[in-house]
């Protein structure tokens, strides 16, 4: 999947599509087996060192690695899978970002699904970071506006607030 028909896929769009398919599956909708095979084939094409993911080619991006790991978890990789263990270790060592809400969104979901001590530590850091960075005055009160990454800069306060809200509701999804 990508932004137009018949174009090579990218990890970002594949992530959104697989989250939608996961939600559909949880609502008892049938997901064609060929779709799962194709998603795994794409993820194989952008994976490097068995745990890291790039955007359209093998790589090691923070956000794309979090997306790739979450997709693999949704597609059946278990917590004890070597690729999941290695990827989760990488996310845990990297920790939450002060400005990259896209990475935080996917990494938080990965850590939540992984559970355990690494999730507990991640959750405290992420939650406290969001609470402490929330706007406190005037028209910004209750919102977020991080600086530093493409999405936060382009999307502004609305994007950051939306992503922060979805991060904080991770306890109630999937």
Question: Where are the regions a protein language model picked out?
Answer:
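An alpha-helical repeat/solenoid feature that recognizes helix-turn-helix modules
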Residues: 1-37, 44-89, 93-128, 132-174
């Amino acid at each position: 999947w990508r932004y137009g028909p018949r174009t090579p896929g990218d990890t970002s769009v594949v992530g959104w599509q697989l989250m939608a398919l996961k939600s559909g599956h949880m609502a008892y909708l049938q997901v064609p087996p060929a779709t799962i095979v194709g998603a795994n084939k794409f993820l194989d094409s952008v994976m490097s060192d068995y745990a890291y993911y790039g955007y359209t080619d093998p790589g090691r991006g923070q956000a794309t690695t979090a997306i790739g790991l979450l997709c693999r978890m949704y597609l059946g990789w278990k917590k004890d899978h070597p690729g999941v263990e290695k990827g989760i270790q990488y996310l845990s060592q990297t920790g939450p970002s002060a400005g990259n809400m896209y990475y935080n969104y996917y990494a938080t979901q990965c850590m939540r699904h992984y559970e355990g001590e690494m999730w507990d530590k991640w959750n405290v850091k992420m939650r406290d970071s969001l609470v402490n960075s929330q706007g406190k005055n005037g028209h910004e009160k209750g919102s977020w506006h991080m600086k530093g990454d493409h999405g936060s800069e382009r999307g502004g306060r609305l994007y950051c607030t939306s992503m922060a809200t979805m991060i904080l509701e991770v306890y109630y999804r999937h």
